[in-house]
């Protein structure tokens, strides 16, 4: 079967042992159970997916009575210690074609990113780094807007919102939003105060910005929990409409800015489009996912949200140039096509606000996937200087004291060119299975930038989730700690919850100059979460620090370049996750992140690209 990446099928074959169980559940994190791994870095005993030791179970004996804490079923754990904390083991396992696992000199550069690097550069084995410089608002080419307060829609002075936090301000705030929307946009301003919101807030127009004085001075807390499953308390929601499907005339090549169709006369320069394809049996088989990937099989899925830059109808077929390169091979045999798109919101923002939505403990655990803020079907928008805070409605004793969030934090979904910067979210109540406790979440979105953000005490503090088509996203200088996979309402404790890529082949993304005291994971999750399978390919860890565990077991090639001394790294095959062909992802600069140059790949690529543009 032909590989979809730039690699041989033999190199890219990544299968999961057929003994994995098939689990059903809800969209997003449907059956978010814990996969056992064979890692003994925590001491004697068998270890689980999160590297936690199960007392009384050793790695040289069969442990048929170990209970999976999320599903109350029995799993088998057997094998040998494969901890990557042993430098000799790392060197032995990475010797299969990977670069530089021994001594790295001060001021070193990656072999895949020389001083004369250019997009498309690769080594003699076809290994390469995507150009990640397009992530963020305006494709990273412009600064975030400076919001003027000369003319605002003041929720207190103009609309009578109560700044004491005693009475419901939902109506007043929504009226301010609606007035701004009707005026073609504007700043909905929150002066100093505490605002109680008993309902939901909806923004469905472009050019609307919610702005406070600071996260400490302007605070909103939300009280509703019933009926909030899979919704956000503040929701920016576009109304996308897809146009006529235009089949590609030839395969769209990874790294190319061009696609070809027979008739491009219905397209216009500046138009939003989506490039996608059908999840065919051949596509599934090429990724060794037959019997695992099932949720989207036979459906057309959006992979790349793009903008038309130019159209050449003098050629046959017609050539369409887009603003950001494709990040994966788009095959005609998979019915790859262009679909024009309208209805995305743009130039929307949230900044300088404190947000919380924690409620009574049992109420929080009764609803799944409640976000405090979501941006769905938007482009060129931002979230800046937002922080969670202890909700006045959080429990005052027992579990949940001082909680900030009911379940989940910020969600960016089906969007492009969004920046989430300088924001902190922490202390979720519901960190159980079913998609909860995701603090910074992205789904089926492209070129999203998470910069200088901190996530604490969620389940998965930073996460890509549910569905194909998360590409070109960057996590720059983010920090995660305290991730925990809670078992249930009565026992909200458990194993380490990693930041991770969670579902369906996130492609060509970058984790850059970031710190994980819990961990980050890109692996084959098999049948978990309704067949998550391979969660990533061609993703890069660059200059990664922290005291947690980095797991990279990607389809095709994944890249780990520059790791800190205290960070554990796990690349080799495992019984229940990762590869089964004995290969490992590319590792370079093990325990040498401090001297990696440049320290940020995204910022260097962006400066390089902008310096070359006229």
Language model: regions and residue ranges:
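Catalytic domains of carbohydrate-active enzymes that cleave complex glycans
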Residues: 479-483, 489-496, 507-614
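Ser/Thr-rich, Pro/Gly/Ala-heavy low-complexity intrinsically disordered linkers and tails
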Residues: 1-103
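Right-handed parallel beta-helix
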Residues: 178-181, 207, 216, 336-394, ...
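Extracellular "leader-to-stem" segments immediately downstream of a signal peptide or signal-anchor
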Residues: 83-84, 88-191, 196-361, 365, ...
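Short glycine/acidic-rich loop motifs that flank beta-strands on beta-rich extracellular proteins
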Residues: 185, 198-200, 219-223, 359-364, ...
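Residue-level signal for WD-repeat beta-propeller blades
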Residues: 182, 189, 202-204, 228, ...
